[in-house]
Amino acid sequence: MPNHQSGSPTGSSDLLLSGKKQRPHLALRRKRRREMRKINRKVRRMNLAPIKEKTAWQHLQALISEAEEVLKTSQTPQNSLTLFLALLSVLGPPPVTGESYWAYLPKPPILHPVGWGSTDPIRVLTNQTMYLGGSPDFHGFRNMSGNVHFEGKSDTLPICFSFSFSTPTGCFQVDKQVFLSDTPTVDNNKPGGKGDKRRMWELWLHTLGNSGANTKLVPIKKKLPPKYPHCQIAFKKDAFWEGDESAPPRWLPCAFPDKGVSFSPKGALGLLWDFSLPSPSVDQSDQIKSKKDLFGNYTPPVNKEVHRWYEAGWVEPTWFWENSPKDPNDRDFTALVPHTELFRLVAASRHLILKRPGFQEHEMIPTSACVTYPYAILLGLPQLIDIEKRGSTFHISCSSCRLTNCLDSSAYDYAAIIVKRPPYVLLPVDIGDEPWFDDSAIQTFRYATDLIRAKRFVAAIILGISALIAIITSFAVATTALVKEMQTATFVNNLHRNVTLALSEQRIIDLKLEARLNALEEVVLELGQDVANLKTRMSTRCHANYDFICVTPLPYNATEDWERTRAHLLGIWNDNEISYNIQELTNLISDMSKQHIDAVDLSGLAQSFANGVKALNPLDWTQYFIFIGVGALLLVIVLMIFPIVFQCLAKSLDQVQSDLNVLLLKKKKGGNAAPAAEMVELPRVSYT
C-alpha cells in the first residue's frame, strides 16, 4: 500500500484488491467469524455457575493452616501481624493472571479408578496357566509401591474385591468355591482309548461366593453376547480329551444363559451376574454320590454344596455387570458389561487347592496373577477404604494403600481396587500474557509487523513493562494459591517431560513363544494408544512453545469452579453437572483447530510485512523530515522577530499616549499647556 499522504505510515490492507478477489476473501472471513461465534456460544453453554458454599469453621481452620504453612516455608516468626499478612497472601492473589487454555496431556502421571461399567478389557496373566487358564506372566515385572493416599472419582461403581472377613461399602466379598470336572480313563482296548470309568478332578479357588445375604440363587434367563456360547452346545463331553490321564480339564469360555446368579455389592446398587454355574439352585452332590462307582469311589466335599460340576471342563466365571434397571421386572433387555478374566485375579488371592483323581490328599498350589498395562491394583485394609456415592458420582479414597500390578496369597487380609492410567487428560494451563500461536515463524512476522508501527511500538513497551511488574509482584504472594489450582503451562510441560523420561515403559520379551506374543500384544496396544495420541496431536493446533503437552486454542474460563476440573482429573469424564463432558470439549478443540488451519494468510502476511518494511525506507521519510525542518525554521524565525516587533509596538504605544496627553493639556482653559515662565523655545537642529 502506498504511503499515507498526511504523514504517519499505516499498515497494509486489502482495499486495493480487485472486486473479484476481495469478495471471496471477505466472505471467508465472515464465515469464520460466524463459526467462531457458534463455538464461543457452545463454550458458554458448557459453563456451570459456581456453587457458593457457606463459610464454616473448618474452612477457617484450613485457611489458618495454610497461612501457618506460608510462614513456615518463608521462615518467618509467627505472631499476630505476620499471621494476618499470611492470611492476606492466601486470600488475596487470584489463581492465574494470564491467558488460560485447555491443554491436551497424553499419558499423564495419575491414576483413575476403573468402574464396573468400563467396556475396556482387563487382561490378567497368571503363573499357573495349567490350573487357571489364560496367558502366562513370565515376561512381566512385579512392582509394589510404598504407602500412598489415593483419591479418585468414578461414574460407575469401582471394581473392588475384599479378601478379608470385613468388606468395605461398594465391594464384593469373595468366597472359596469348588469346581468339579471328570475325564475318561485310558483303555487302549476300547474304541477311542476311553475306558468305562471316569476320573474326577476337584479344584478349590476363591471367587464370588453363592452364599450370604448379597447373593440370589434364583436362576434368571438373560440374553448374552454372541461371543459367549451356550456350554452344552459349544463344548461336548470329552471334546478336548487327548488321551492323557495326568492332564487336568480345560477352562471353557462359555456360559449357561438360563442359569444366571446375581451378586450385590455391599451397601450399593447394581448387580454382578455369573452364568458359569451348571446347577445354581440344585446341589449336585447327591448326583455324584449316586454314581460313586463310575468316578472311582470319589466322595464330594462334606458340608459344601456343589454347583459347578460340568463334564466337558471347568467353566470360566465370566462376570457381567448390570446397572440398576428402572424397572426391576424388565431385566432381560438391560445391557450387560462382561469382565472375562477378573476371576483369575481373585483366585490368586489364596492358594489353589487341587485334588487329583485317585489321591486322598489335597495339593496346595501357590498362584499369582498380574494385570497388564495400563492397569494397576490398589491394595489397602478394608477399614481404610471408603467408597461413597454422592449424587451420581462415586468418591473413592484409600489411606495407607499400596500400588502393585500383581496379587498373590499375601493379599488375603486386604481389599483390592482396580485403577488405570488414563490415555490423556484435558488440563487448563496459564500461558501468561503471551498470545496463543502455533507457528513461531509466523508469530515473529506478526511481532515485527506490529513493532513497525510507531504508536504500537511504544504501547508494546509500556504493556510489556507493566506485565513484567505484575508477574513479579504476584508470583511471591500467589504461590500457595497457585499450587492448589491451575498450574502454568511451563510447569506442566516440564513435569510431563520428566515423567515421560523417567516412567517410559520397558518391555522384556521372554524366550517362550506364548510369553513373547503376550508381550508383543501389550506393546502393540500401547503403540496403538501412542499412535492415537500422535493423531490427536497432529490434527490439533498446539502452542508452539510447549513440546511435551499440547496447549490447544480453546480458552478456559478461569472464573469457573475448580472442582469441575478436579473431578475430571480424578476420573469423571462424561458428566456435565459436576465436571466437563470430555467428548464435547474434544469436539470444540477440533472445530477451533480447523478454524486455525486456514486462518493464517501467508501471502497477505508477507505483503503486510513487506509494506511495513517499505514504509521504513529513509527515502520515503525524507519529505516528512523536510516538512519538520521547514516548520522548525519558521518557528525559530518567529521567535527571533517577536522581541523586536514587541519593542516597536511598545514604543508606538508610548508615543501615542504622550500625544494624547499634550492634546488634553492644550484644550484646558488658561491658554498654553505650560506656564510662560517655564516655556523655553528649543533650538532647531538641522540634520543637513
From Swiss-Prot:
Enumerate the UniProt keywords alphabetically.
Cleavage on pair of basic residues, Coiled coil, Disulfide bond, Fusion of virus membrane with host cell membrane, Fusion of virus membrane with host membrane, Glycoprotein, Host cell membrane, Host membrane, Host-virus interaction, Membrane, Signal, Transmembrane, Transmembrane helix, Viral attachment to host cell, Viral envelope protein, Viral penetration into host cytoplasm, Virion, Virus entry into host cell
Task: Please indicate if the UniProt record lists Signal as a keyword.
Answer: yes
Region feature Disordered, mapped onto this chain: 1-31
Report the glycosylation sites.
127, 143, 498, 557
Site entry (Cleavage), positions: 454-455
Keyword Coiled coil on this protein? yes
Q: How does it assemble?
A: The mature envelope protein (Env) consists of a trimer of SU-TM heterodimers attached by noncovalent interactions or by a labile interchain disulfide bond.
Name of the protein this chain belongs to: Envelope glycoprotein gp70
